[in-house]
Structure formats: structure tokens, C-alpha cells
Amino acid sequence: MKRLPLPALAAAFLAAAIAVRAQTTRPAPEDGATVHEIEFSNFDSDLSPGEATTVTPAQLAEIYGPNVGFLDPYGFNRPLDLLIEPLDDIYDKLGLRLGTAYTMLYLQSMGGQAGGQARAAGDIDFMSSWTLIGRGTEDTGRFIFTGEYRFGVDDDPPSTLGPQMGTLIPPTNAFNARGWVVRDAYWIQRLFDARVRILLGRGDPSDFVGAHWMQNVNNSFVNRHFSANPAVPFPGHGPLLGLSLRPIPEYYLTAGAANAYSNTELVEIDSLFEYGDLFSFLETGYTPTFEKLGPGRYAAGIWHMAQRDRTNQPEDYGFTLIADQRLAGNFQVFARYAYSDGTLTNIRHLGQAGLGWSGLGGRRDDLTGLAFSLAVPVRNTSRDETVLETFHRFQVTQNSQFSVGLQLIANPGNATLNETAGVFYARLRLSF
């Protein structure tokens, strides 16, 4: 495979970041840390406080948020005003919020059985959220639609690096070459002052349960230990029904079911009615706000994957425990434990903890992350895998971010060589 020159690719990333303009002028952020800037999942964004920040409403909120980049004072926010202002007018008049994001990832392996391998891929997201009922009230009805295009820069995208390195869980999975897909097409309805929320349509259950606050491959950790919940055999995008209840603001109960045969690359519903096999889930959580700390989330969830006769796959079930907490100032921490009883993911136990620090170096919208994870496999042919990942994300302009990160993978779980491997990565994200 042709190797990608790191200096040239890094230079291209930086050049693109400098060339991009961010959002139109937004309200200046208040002094100090904000929930938005340190990547908290918006408690009121979509279906459940337990959802990941990869859900479309949260991504749109991030695009249109009051970010401040270090190049903004030099006039790099001018060129896209002609594009952004009409989009704002559409939202003001119709309640239709549109957004586009382009994310590029470069990986370079170091050591282990696949050292010196380079991979790069891109991802383009087209997102929309249309409020058609109850705009300006708590009880809104919105239609969410997103499309995505993923492509590899060379023959092998970053998603292929994990198998070559022999990892139990890949350094990344999201950056592949699957092409065009329809990700989301669902209706979300709020009732009784948003205490009841119902989701119906095409979606991915992994966006709504089992996630921690820093679970976002686009702007946070990249390794799938942290950017997903790899102990759970989520089926992908397809028919989904979700219900979330909030009897009091500090408590939630979210449940749902999805077609067990859902595949993000396919748009079909026949298998649901022909076989009736479901992936089901339930999550309950407590979301207090501590006076000297800030908001937190403490949740427990269970899930069940039915036996799938069509694909000859066995039944599986498990549970997840999650703690997210903001600490005083610009810090947040998370911890997660996940258990799977079956063999679908080859992960029996997953335990991890991490932290995020916003404002390192005095730039309030920069984010630094550090996390540790241990995965224990089901099969005795694999071994325990431990991962340490750190990254720093620079807010270049209001809507452009550049990140660099490092992963250390001790004893990759399926490798023939029992030694530590490493992965360096660089990531660019542009959005408007």
C-alpha cells in the first residue's frame, strides 16, 4: 500500500483549516466554562439525556454554537457570510435548520505487528432538523434527516488498521469507505411540556443509549473503546421506536426497540415484519446539578439482542453503568462499565475512565482529553487489551477544528505479537 506522507498531509489539514470560515457572527460567550464548550450532551436536545453528542440536533447545536477560534480576530470569519445568512433566514422563517460537516482523519501506526502503516479517510455529513409542530413551545414535533458520504484517501481506509494490528477493538471504525448512506429519517415528538418524548423512524439505537459525554469520534476520542460502546452489538441504522419519560427534571427513563437486522448501508423494513427479531434497550438515569460542581449524569441500562435465525446469530444480553460529572471550572470526568453475556462482540467486560479539560493555554474552546480502558474478551484465543488515549483539539475558527492525538495499545487482544503498539492521528473538522 502506498504510504501517505505525514508532513504533507498535516500541512494540507492546516491550510484547509485556515482557509475555512466559520459560522456567522454569534453572541459572545460568557466568561468561564459553559456546558456547550466542554462537550456535555445537551439534556434537552433530542430523545434522552443519555444520548451521545453524535445525534443530529446536538451536532447542529455545536455547529451554530458560540465557538471562538484563535484565528477569528484576524478576519477569517468573513467569506461564508453569504452562505450562512440565507440558512439562518430559512431557519427563522420555516424552522428548518440545515448543517454540513466535513471530517478528515489521518492515522499512523507505530510498533506492533503492523507498525508504519498510514491510513486516511473523509466523512461528509448533511444534516437537517425541521420543527413542524409547536415551534417556540416545549411540545415540538421535528423531522430529522441526515445523509452521509464516507471515502478512503487510499486503497485501505483507517477502519482496516485494527485487524492488521490485531486489536480486540479497532483504533477507529467510523472512518471507512462505505460511500453514500441515509443515516437518520425519524420523527421526534414532545408531549406534556416535554416530559414525554417519542421517536419513530430510521435511526441508530447507539446514538441514544449506553453513551458517555465524550463519546464522539468527530471531535473527541477516536479509538472505538471510547468513541462507541463496543460491548453492545448495536444493529445499525434502521426502523427504531424510542420512548423517554421525565417525571421530574432530575430523572429519566428511556426505552426502545429496533429491527435486529438493521444495516446502515441498506434502507429496508421487510426483515422486521418477516422475522420480528428485535434489539431492545432500557436506560434509567439521575441528572443532578451540584452547587459547587455542576451537572452530572448517573445511569444504568440493560439491553437484549434476540436470536437471529436469518443470519444464524445467537441471542445476547448485557448491561452498562455510566457516570458523567462536571467538576468545578473547565473539567469533566466520565467512567463506564459494560458487560455482555454472549459472543457477538467478543467483549465480556469493558471498564474505562477519562477526563476532559477545556481551555488549556487560555483558549476556552480548545479541548484536551485523556482516557484509559480495559477490555476483557469472551474467547480464550484473545487476551485482555488496555488502551490509553490522549488528544488535544484546537478551535481554529468558529467552525473549524484541528486535533492531534495518540493511542497506546498494550497487548493488542488478537495480535500474534505480545507487545505495545501505538497510533498517532490528526483530524480536521469543518462545518457550516
Descriptions of predicted regions:
Residues Q113-A118, S271-G276, R308-P314, Y339-L350, ...:
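Solvent-exposed loop/turn segments connecting transmembrane beta-strands
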Residues V20-S109, G115, T131-T137:
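N-terminal periplasmic/intermembrane-space "pro-region" immediately following the signal or transit peptide
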Residues P86-D88, M127-S129, Y186-I188, G242, ...:
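Outer-membrane beta-barrel architecture
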Residues T100-Y106, F143-Y149, I198-R202, L253-N259, ...:
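Transmembrane beta-barrel strands of outer-membrane/channel proteins
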Residues D156-Y186, D193-F279, E283:
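Surface-exposed coil loops of outer-membrane beta-barrel proteins
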Residues T420-F432:
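Outer-membrane beta-barrel "beta-signal"
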Residues L80-L98, T131-F143, F192-R195, P249-E250, ...:
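Short loop/turn motifs that connect adjacent beta-strands in outer-membrane beta-barrel proteins
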Residues L282, Y286-V378:
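Detector for outer-membrane/organellar transmembrane beta-barrel domains
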